[in-house]
């Protein structure tokens, strides 16, 4: 028993469970002075925003202080990563502390937009001042977002899984309810349900295959014995981005939806804004095509976030490693980036077919939105499980060695 509790993996796991208890407890703290009987307070975007909030640690159903979730932080990470590719801005050349501070400023700006959009549309109880309630709830929602960011950082340093655990628990708590409500709303024949179950099994197999498949690049390591050289490889995933594109595209596309809600409240009689908001509404052709395009784009972007050729080439050069037939430095970086680009396109096409293809059914019936998002949900869920599994496996690896003395 003492040996079990002395395990690093067990200690980190228990700390993660403690943080999850805090998260679940906070998600039950309801925003004050709000009429909870009104469910469709965000108009036509309620279903999508509630679903996307559940994927990012939020919950627009219970209207708690964690309703917005980690969506502002995730959207800020996407924008920061895009800005970092610009050499003119020079964001990546600044100190780490400055970069973190600027990312938090960007997170705050997005959190203000989303929190204010939600607060302005909240059904406030008539006996209280609407302005004060909106102001107070906006501050509470922003504070809830930053509290979740803090919990994620704590879990990354002292627990297992980082922010993934919070997102995973939110999905487990909220998504099944959304799916069951869809089956109650939309009549689906039994034969179609059986077919969907079979397709789910096939999709799960393909998903595991894509996540575990690796392209091995032989690497020569200085000081490694000749008989071990055949085991020395640089591994590149067949789908380098994994399930991250789907997770972040849901967060990223929710920002314009919140922005349109906010602008619609500020300019209620603006015909151009109303027309644009209507065209970009969830389930409309413009939104579906943008969703599929951004999903493919994020598949490429996050592939390079996961496998950065410059960083890998620099690390190999410093440690005296090199790829057979490739000069160290710039040539190695170019070689790795070409491979990553090639596999990111393959992964992007896989993501578009599996997670983007079902969204085309939404063009015929918007009630199928939640069901159409299930394949992408599987991709996101599978990526999280594999990530946590690999982290636990790495923690337990050090415990397999016995001390010499």
Swiss-Prot record:
A single cellular component GO annotation: plasma membrane
Subcellular localization(s) per the UniProt record: Cell membrane
Transmembrane parts of this sequence: 14-34, 63-83, 104-124, 131-151, 156-176, 191-211, 247-267, 285-305, 343-363, 368-388
InterPro entries from the UniProt entry: SecY/SEC61-alpha, SecY2, SecY_dom_sf
Pfam families for this protein: SecY
Function (record text): Part of the accessory SecA2/SecY2 system specifically required for export of possible cell wall proteins. The central subunit of a protein translocation channel.
PANTHER family, alphabetized: SECY/SEC61-ALPHA FAMILY MEMBER
Family statement drawn from the similarity comment of this UniProt entry: Belongs to the SecY/SEC61-alpha family. SecY2 subfamily.
Official protein name in the record: Accessory Sec system protein translocase subunit SecY2
Native source species: Streptococcus pneumoniae (strain CGSP14)
Gene it is expressed from: secY2
